[in-house]
Amino acid sequence: MARHGDTRSPSPVGSTYSSSRRNRRDDDRYERSRRDDGRSYRRSRSPERRYRERERDRDRDAFRRRDRSLDRRDEDSYRPGRRERSRDRRRSRERDDYRRRSRDRDYRSRREDSRDRARRRTDDSADLKYKSRRDDSRDRAKDAPRSRETSKPSTPAATAAPTEDEKRAERLAKLEAWKQKQAAEKERKQREAAAAGGARSILEEIDRKSGLSPAVSSPQSPATPGVDATPGTYTGKFDPKAIAKSASSTPAPPAVLGNDVAVPPSVKPVTTIPSQVKPKSTTSASATLKAKGNVGGFGLGTKQAADTEKSTATKTLGFGEEESTRRKLERLPTPPLEDAKDVNGTADGAADEDEDDVDMQDGGTEEEAAAAARAAAERREERLQSEAIKAQSNGAESNDTVMGDAPSQEAADNMEVDAQEEEEIDPLDAFMSELAESAPPKKKVGAKFSRTKEQQPEALFGDEHDIDMTAVGDGDADDFLAIANKAKKKKDIPAVDHKKVEYETFRKKFYTEPSDLAQMSDEEAASLRLELDGIKVRGVDVPKPVQKWSQCGLGVQTLDVIDKLGYEKTTSIQAQAIPAIMSGRDVIGVAKTGSGKTIAFLIPMFRHIKDQRPLDNMEGPVGLIMTPTRELATQIHKDCKPFLKALNLRAVCAYGGAPIKDQIADLKRGAEIIVCTPGRMIDLLAANAGRVTNLRRVTYVVLDEADRMFDMGFEPQVMKIMANIRPDRQTVLFSATFPRNMEALARKTLTKPIEIVVGGKSVVAPEITQIVEVRNDDQKFVRLLELLGNLYSSDENEDARALIFVDRQEAADALLRELMRKGYPCMSIHGGKDQIDRDSTIEDFKAGIFPVLIATSVAARGLDVKQLKLVVNYDAPNHLEDYVHRAGRTGRAGNTGTAVTFLTEDQERYSVDIAKALKQSGQKVPEPVQKLVDAFLEKVKAGKEKASASGFGGKGLERLDQERDAARMRERRTYKTGEEGEDEEEKEEKNEQAEERFNKAISSVQSTAAPSLPGVPKGIDLDGKITVHKTEKDPNSTSKNPLDKVGSAVADIHARLSRAGVMRSGVPIDNRGPDAGAFHATLEINDFPQKARWAVTNRTNVAKILEATGTSITTKGSFYPTGKVPGPGENPKLYILVEGETELAVTNAMRELMRLLKEGTIAAADSDARAPVGGRYNVV
C-alpha cells in the first residue's frame, strides 16, 4: 500500500528491492484479489486487526488528495492522478479486474508500486507487523538480512503444523547437544588461558579506557528450554552492508553466523532481552555477540580474560548506528561462504514457494532460516576449534600471545577475519575509527589478515599508508620530470631516416612538348624569350616557353576555371615556369611583382596531386606551400579556391595568430594542400605527438618569397620542415627578389634546378612611377596630405586605394590618428595586432570600405589589391629588397601606379639601395638623393661607415646556436674539462692567431677618431693593443729585516690560499691593492653604455675571469655622467684595475674584459635600435 513520505529516490545500495523485483511483480499481477482481502495471516500475539485498520485508513487518506500541488508538497509525489486511479481499481476485489487491465494499470503497477514499497519499508521498520500476503511477499526477502542485523530472538510459531513441531523438536535436540559441547570446550579453553593472566589485565585496562565493558552479554537463544521468548519489536535501522549481502545474486558475500540464533556467552543462565524494552543502542544480532575479545582480535594480540562472568551488563556496541560504526573499529561477524549459501538459499526458497501456502509462509521462512543458521554455527564451530589449536601452537612458537576462542567468547570467534572477507571492511572507516582507540603497545610490520594471528589495525593501515605514499611520491617525481621534459620537447620534430621509410612512387613529369614548339629552333626560342620581357634561363634541358594555355598539358576542368577567371594568355613567368615544373624539374623563379607567380606554381600542383591516389584517413597533404607572412598565406589560399571546387580538392590555410584547434580539425578531415607559415607548421607537426598531420605524402613543395624564407629569420624552421619531407620531392621557389647569398642557401634544397629570371633580380616593374624626395620629418606629413589630395581630386580615382608604409608599429598608430583627424578614413595593420584584426583589415581594404591603409612591412610581400594606385614609403625602407616589394604593391598585372619615398638627411645609408633600384628600373636618380649617396660612399671609403649588406639579416636560431657553442668553448678553455682533444686545441690556437691577424689588419685601416661601434667612447680602442705596466716598488718602503720579508710572504700566501675560490655575496671579489701583483693594467669603463659596464662588473663574469687567469680585478673610481669631468681632488672616472703575477695573465684578463665590453656595447646598440619597434618584425 502507498504510504506517506514517498520519494523517487532509488533503493539503498544492497537493498532487497532489486533482488526480489520479479517476485513482487508477480505478486502485483496475480494476487490482487488477495492482498487487500483483509484476511490475517499473522500470529495471534500481535494486535493485528487494530493495526491493519489504522494503516488502511492512513493509506486511503494518502490517495484522497487529488490536487497535484498538494501532493507534490506533502508527499513528494509526482503522479498523484495515476496513483488515485490505480488505487480505485486496487480496492476492487473481483478477479475480473485483473483480466481487464489497461495500459494505465500496468504502468501503475510498475512505476508507482516502487514508491509504495519504499514507503511501506519506512513504516514497517518501527514495529514489523505482519501484513497481508502482498506485503509479506515483498518483505520476505528482507527477513533474512533483518534477522542478521537485529537482536530479536525468534521462536517457532505456536500454531505451526505437526510437521513443523517435529522439525522444531529435532532442532532443539541438536541445539542441546551443541550447547553441552560448547560448555566442555569452554572449560578446556579457560584452563589453557590461565597462563595469560597478565595479558588479560592489560586488555581489561584498555577496554576500560576505550569505554568498552569487559564482557557483553548476548541475547538468549530462541531454543533455550524453559524460556518463552516473544519476538521483540525492531526499532533500529537496516544495515546497508548486510542488505547488500543478502540481495546479491551470487552467494559470494558470506552470511552472518547464526542469523536469529545467538550463542550463549557462558554456561550460566542468560538473560533475555524483552521485546517491550528498547535497547539504548540499536544493534543487530551479530553486533550483540560482542565481547572484548574482538578488540584483541584486531591486533592487540592478547588472550581474552577468563573471568568474563564478572559483568552481567547488557550493554552492547551500537553497530546499527552509522556514527558508532565509524567510532569503533569492529567487523560484523560473518559465516563462511557455504553458510551464506544455506541462509540465502533458505530465504530465496521461501520467496519462491507456492503462493497458496499463505498460512505457514511466515513461520516456515523464519524457522528454516534459524535451522540453517544453527547448522552453519555447528560447522563453523568445528572449524574454528581446530584453527584455535593451531593458532595457540603458532603463537607459542613466535612468542605472540594468541587469543583463545572459549565457548563463552563466541563473539570473538565471530569477529575472526578471513582472508576471503577482506573486501568487506571499509579501510577509511577502519582507519578513522582507530583514531579514537587507544594506541597499541607496538606496531607489527607487514600486517596481514589471517585466521591464526590477530593483527593491529594501526599496523595494517599505517604500513599500507606509508608504502603507498612512498610509491606515489617516487612515481610523481618521475612523472613531473617526464612532464617537464615533454614540455621542453614540445615543438621538436624528430628527424626522419628516409632510408628506413618506404615511400610510394609518384610521377613528376606530365608535360609533353607540343609539335609546334618542338619544331622551334634554339634561335627562335631565344628570340621568343626576349619578347617575353627578356626571360633569362639557366640550367640543363630547359623547356621552351609556351604561348597559350592549351600548350601546358592541363585538364579540362582547370582550363575552364582559367577561362572563367579571365586569364586570356600566359604571363612571362607563367609561359616559362609552367612547362618547366610540369616536366618534373626543380625551379627557381624570379619575376617582377604582380607578374602572376602564384598561378605559375598552383596549376602544376593541381595536376601533380590529381595524378596520385586519394588520401586515406589520417594521411597528410600532398602539396605544401610555405610563405613568410600570414597575409600572403591567406591570399594564396584564396587564389586556390576556384580550382579546388572544380577539381574536388581540399586546402587548409595554417598560420599563427589564428586558433590552432580549427586548423587541426581541418587537417584531420583531410586536405591535399596546406598553405602555411613555417612556425605554425612546426606546431602542427609536433601537436599530439605528431598525430595531427605528417609529411609522408608530401611530394610537391613551394616556397613563396623564397629569399625571405632562407633568411636567418626563417631558414632554421624551413630546413627543419624540409628535412622531414622525402628527398625525391619536387621543390619550387618563387620570389620577386633573390640576393646572391640567399640563392646559395636555397640551392642546397634543390636538385639540378632550372633558374628563371624575368626582367632581372630585385628590379621594380617598369609600370611603376618612382618618386624619391628628401624632406625633413616635420614636412613629411604635409607632403603626404598633398599626395592624397591630388590622388582623390579627380573623379576617375574615386575608387583608388593608397598604401602608406612606416617602419614601426607606434608610428603606424600615430599616423593613423593624424590622418583620421584630417578626415581620411583609414586603418592600420602591423604585427602587434591580433590576427583576426589583420585579416579583417585586409579584406576591408580590398573591398574598398576604407581607401587608405597604413602598414609596416608585413603587408609588403604578396599583397594584391586591385585599384591600388599610390604607395607612399613614409619611412624609408632599409634595404633594396624591401623597397622593391613595397613599390611592387602597385602597378600589378599590367596596370600603372606610383611609388613615393621620403628620405631624411640622416638616412644616407638607405639612399644607396634606393638609387640602385632607380637605376635598374631605368629611372633617373634625383639630385638630392645622389648627394646623399655620394656623402655615404665617402664615409665608407674613409672607414667612418660600413656598407650595409643586402637582405633582412634577421636574428634566427643560428645565432643562438653560435652563441651557445662559443660559450661552451670558452668554458672548456677556462676550466680545462679534458673533453677537448689536441686537434681541437690546435684548431683553437690557429683560429685565435687568425683572429689576431684580422683584428690587427682592421685596426690599422679604421680611423681612431671614429670608433667602429656606436656607444664606444672616443679614444678607447677595444681591438687595439693592451698595455700592461710593471708594478715598481719603492726600495725605501720595504724593511731590510729578513724576518719581516719572510713574515709578509707567509701572510700573503695564507691570505691567497684562504681567499682562493671563495665567493660570498656582499663581499668584494678581490680587494688586493696595487702592490698585490707584479703587473697591472687599467681599463676605463665610465663612458660605456650601462649594459657594457654591467658585463665587466657583475660577479658571474668577473669570477670566470678570475678562475681562468688567476688575476685580481678591482672596480675603482666613481661614475660621472657623459660630458662631466672630475675636478681636482675628486675620484677619477670609473675604471677597472687588473693585477697579476705575470704579464700574460694580465693580458688575457684584459682581453676577456674588452671582449665583454664589446659584446655589451653591441647589445646596447641593438636594444636601442629595436626598443621603439616593440613588435616581432624588424623589416619584412
Swiss-Prot record:
Sequence motif DEAD box, residues: 704-707
Record comment regarding domains: The Q motif is unique to and characteristic of the DEAD box family of RNA helicases and controls ATP binding and hydrolysis.
Composition-biased stretches (Acidic residues): 350-369
This protein's name: Pre-mRNA-processing ATP-dependent RNA helicase prp5
The entry's keywords: ATP-binding, Helicase, Hydrolase, mRNA processing, mRNA splicing, Nucleotide-binding, Nucleus
GO aspect biological process, one term: mRNA processing
Source taxon at top rank: Eukaryota
CDD domains from the UniProt entry: DEADc_DDX46, SF2_C_DEAD
Catalytic activity, EC: 3.6.4.13
Cellular-component GO terms for this entry: nucleus
Compartments reported by the entry: Nucleus
Bias kind Polar residues: ranges: 272-287, 391-401
Record keyword Ribosomal protein present: no
Positions of ATP binding: A591, K592, T593, G594, S595, G596, K597, T598
Motif (Q motif): 547-575
Enzyme class, spelled out: hydrolase
SUPFAM superfamilies in the cross-refs: P-loop containing nucleoside triphosphate hydrolases
Family to which this protein belongs: Belongs to the DEAD box helicase family. DDX46/PRP5 subfamily.
The protein's role, per its UniProt record: ATP-dependent RNA helicase involved spliceosome assembly and in nuclear splicing. Catalyzes an ATP-dependent conformational change of U2 snRNP. Bridges U1 and U2 snRNPs and enables stable U2 snRNP association with intron RNA.
Residue ranges of domain Helicase C-terminal in the record: 783-933
